[in-house]
A protein has these predicted regions:
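Conserved catalytic core of two-metal-ion nucleotidyltransferases
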Residues: 1-27, 70-127, 146-189
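A short secondary-structure junction signal
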Residues: 129-135
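A generic "cationic amphipathic patch" detector
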Residues: 69-70, 132
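Short hydrophobic/aromatic beta-strand micro-patches
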Residues: 57-59
């Protein structure tokens, strides 16, 4: 396994966050650091030493506004990438990426993007615990279908691990699953 110094990558991601922070302040958009980014900020006073990405969450209205105006609001070389502006984009959330770089992720070999930070929309949830569980189950079902549609079915072995993605591609499209997930995620806003 190759070893490399991850710090320059982390610092470039931090540059992206600073640009996003400036845009959010200028346009009164709310965002929060979340997941491993929040853990790193609290526990390590910065990045988790081995972390190679940054995660923020935005209330849906602010997220949609940022995605709609990112091309005009973000300074070059930063750009927002989401399914709404790139139909080959395989994820149910956005990335703000550095368009002057290329980052190849093993999980998404067909999608070439730049160094990035993830932007997750924060949506409403049902009131009851049962409805919340069903909502999560439905979300994770479609997220798995999305993964099967996008991944290379022959890269991960033979048998079921290769034919399930082929079967999913027969019955689902990337666009259809993305639109279903978006409607579902926004249904409690």
């Amino acid at each position: 396994m190759a070893t490399y110094d991850i710090r320059p990558l982390q610092l470039r991601i931090l540059d992206i966050l600073m640009a996003v922070d400036k845009v959010c302040k200028e346009h009164n958009l709310r965002y929060y650091i979340i997941a491993g980014t929040l853990l790193g900020a609290v526990r390590h006073k910065g990045f988790i030493p081995w972390d190679d990405d940054l995660d923020i969450g935005m209330p849906r209205a602010d997220y949609d506004l940022l995605m709609a105006h990112a091309a005009e609001w973000l300074p070059a070389p930063f750009e927002a990438v989401c399914f709404e502006n790139d139909t080959t984009y395989p994820l149910p959330f956005a990335k703000i990426q550095d368009g002057s770089t290329t980052l190849i992720e093993r999980m998404h070999l067909k999608y070439l993007g730049g160094i990035y930070l993830d932007v997750f929309p924060l949506d409403g949830m049902p009131d009851s615990k049962l409805a919340q569980r069903l909502h999560f189950m439905k979300y994770f079902f479609y997220k798995k279908i999305l993964y099967f549609i996008y991944r290379d079915p022959y890269r991960h072995g033979k048998g079921m691990s290769s034919w399930i993605p082929l079967l999913c591609r027969k019955f689902f499209t990337l666009k259809g699953v993305q639109e279903t997930m978006r409607r579902m995620m926004k249904s409690y806003d």
